[in-house]
Curated annotation (Swiss-Prot):
The organism's place on the tree of life at top rank: Bacteria
UniProt source species: Methylorubrum extorquens (Methylobacterium dichloromethanicum)
Extent of the signal sequence: none
Recorded name of the encoding gene: phaC
Identification of the protein by name: Poly(3-hydroxyalkanoate) polymerase
Localization, UniProt: Cytoplasm
Gene Ontology biological process terms in this record: poly(3-hydroxyalkanoate) biosynthetic process; poly-hydroxybutyrate biosynthetic process
Length: 605
């Protein structure tokens, strides 16, 4: 049974008129806020960010989709067949709608997938008019997707970009986003006399002002979280700080710990506390509770001073310096290291460099949703061709970094229905403030990228794939992953669109030692932040080395219920089972500089 439908009360036109006048005034204020980046400052100069942020993306989208259209125009017969197919689909839909309007029951011509929440309200199916709108949108969208999929004469990168940009367009123009084509929004607007739009426009104005004229759609209540209290909660101490990172040592909760400490290298594209969201979801806290001395790098949120910090800088001043400081703090020369996402790519680069130079202090490596071979990289590869990278480099040259908002927008575009338009509708049309949610607080806590580092990463990994080809050079050393012989734990997640499971699987073959490939459920974040307990729902698969075809490995792998965290702990323990008395951070050769989570994590983009 669907949601019970009730007839709305008659609209209060006096209230609607009053709210319409107020809405016009708030709209005027919002328009003024959106023009702030274009206002003159001083002697007529434009404020930073005066160029329209989305212009380059719109130009690229237009060029890409035009190339697809041109391939169809070159084959009129095939284009006519496609148009005929679309016409037949709409004829069937119109016939079905007329039949429904005569009181008969008909099967829908097309339906949204069960996971599509946009059309969940009963009126989308019960009301013939809105059902027609919904099915028309779905038919046109699927026809457009098929046009891209079957276009001939375009390379796969262009096709991938076209699919990506088409997904953005279809998400933006969904009838669920607009009052007059969404029955639920229309009902609410009439019942409230437009007060929901008033609240929404006020939030839009606030978000434009907060973004300096650029719209930053709020996803959560940013005032609801405090570091050390609500997020990044595991106790510890900052025991070292340099220009690029703070090194945090976490306080033990067991009397003894594994002798070999663990260094976690998070990505610098976002902040480390995704691994320490709260006591229930903290991978860091859970590893501490198992008796591991955990160290974590907290990267600086860079500014113009860091423009020349490149991949080698992050290796030397990040991972290698952290290992040195761990030795000072604990007396241990050997460490286990774990890298997450691009932090894992940096860890792999460091391992290859150390293998070439005879420095072998990292005795085991764990990679969490990490790519070393970018042949089958995820949707972010859409932004990585020569033209787009040059445009990014030109933009970074202005200030020495890539703005955090641009990187955050790129990640949000990977899931536009969930991470963009659902919040646009909720905030600005329904007029509802988003709820407090720690994961979305972290998602909104953007970081900048130094120009030299980001350019190296885009060109050497996404564009030219030099690490996988044995062509990457760092510190005048050519890197060869086959020389990396340490045991490797390589975690992928089944639904990852950033580091696809296939990409991680094939990257496993690039290492020269034993690799334990593990496939967890869910995606890039939820598949990693998957604590043990009664709520552990995704499970994971193990099957030893990643050999042969990915599909064959999955079919033959053993499926396990629950979290992969205990499996990983056992793997670490097997590498070095010796235990020693627990180490108290800040009491040895390196005194505490600040309590965890430190100062760098608090820097805003």
């Amino acid at each position: 049974m669907g949601t019970e439908r009730t007839n709305p009360a008659a609209p209060d036109f006096e209230t609607i008129a009053r709210n319409a006048n107020q809405l016009a005034e708030v709209f005027r204020q919002s328009a003024a806020a959106s023009l702030k980046p274009f206002e003159p400052a001083g002697q007529g100069a434009l404020l930073p960010g005066a160029n329209l942020q989305g212009a380059s993306e719109i130009d690229e989208m237009t060029r890409t989709l035009t190339r697809v259209a041109e391939t169809w125009l070159k084959d009129p017969e095939k284009a006519l067949q496609a148009q005929t197919k679309l016409g037949q689909s709409f004829a069937a839909l119109w016939a079905s709608t007329l039949t429904r309007m005569q009181g008969a029951v008909t099967e829908p011509v097309v339906q949204p997938p069960p996971t599509d929440k946009r059309f969940a309200h009963a009126d989308w199916s019960a009301n013939p008019v809105f059902d027609l709108i919904k099915q028309s949108y779905l038919l046109l969208g699927r026809w457009a997707e098929e046009m891209v999929e079957t276009a001939e004469g375009i390379d796969e990168h262009t096709r991938h970009k076209a699919e990506f940009y088409l997904r953005q367009l279809l998400s933006a123009y969904s009838p669920s986003n607009f009052v007059m084509t969404n029955p639920e929004l229309l009902r609410q607007t009439l019942e409230e006399g437009g007060a929901n739009l008033m609240r929404g426009m006020k939030m839009l104005q606030e978000d434009l002002e907060a973004g300096g004229g650029q719209l930053r759609v709020r996803q959560t209540d940013l005032s609801a979280f405090t570091f050390g209290k609500d997020v990044a909660v595991t106790p510890g101490e900052v025991i070292f700080r340099n220009d690029l990172m703070e090194l945090i040592q976490y306080a033990p909760t067991t009397e003894t710990v594994l002798k070999r400490p663990l260094l976690i290298v998070p990505p610098w594209i976002n902040k480390f506390y995704i691994l320490d969201l709260n006591p229930q979801k903290s991978l860091i806290g859970w590893m501490v509770s198992q008796g591991i001395t955990v160290f974590v790098i907290s990267w600086v949120n860079p500014d113009e001073r860091h423009r020349d910090k490149d991949f080698e800088s992050y290796m030397r001043e990040g991972i290698e310096t952290a290992i040195d400081m761990i030795g000072v703090a604990t007396g241990e020369t050997d460490v286990a290291a774990a890298g997450y996402c691009v932090g894992g790519t940096l860890l792999a680069v460091t391992l290859a460099y150390q293998a070439a130079t005879g420095n072998r202090r990292i005795k085991s490596a764990t990679f969490l949703t990490t790519q070393v071979d970018f042949t089958h990289a995820g949707d972010l590869k859409v932004f990585a061709d020569e033209g787009q990278i040059k445009a990014i480099e030109e933009r970074m040259a202005e200030h020495g970094y890539l703005e955090g908002a641009r990187m955050a927008n790129a990640f949000n575009m990977l899931r536009p229905n969930d991470l963009i338009w659902s919040y646009v509708v909720n905030n600005y049309v329904r007029g509802k403030a988003p709820a407090a949610f720690d994961l979305l607080y972290w998602n909104a806590d953007a970081t900048r990228m130094p120009a030299a580092n980001h350019s190296f990463y885009l060109r050497n990994c996404y564009l030219n794939n030099t690490l996988a080809k044995g062509q990457m050079v760092l510190g005048n050393v050519r890197l060869d992953l086959k020389k990396v012989k340490v045991p490797v734990f390589n975690l992928a997640t089944r639904e990852d669109h950033i580091a696809p499971a296939l990409s991680v699987f094939e990257g496993s073959a690039k290492f020269g030692g034993k690799v334990d490939y593990v496939l967890a459920g869910s995606g890039h974040i939820a598949g990693v932040v998957a604590p043990p307990g009664p709520k552990a729902k995704y499970g994971f698969r193990t099957g030893g080395p990643a050999r042969g075809r990915f599909e064959d490995w999955v079919a033959a792998a053993t499926e396990h219920p629950g979290s992969w965290w205990p499996y990983w702990y056992k793997w670490l323990e097997e590498q070095a089972p010796e235990r020693v008395p627990a180490r108290i951070p800040g009491t040895g050769a390196l005194p505490s500089l600040a309590p965890a989570p430190g100062t760098y994590v608090r820097m805003k983009a």
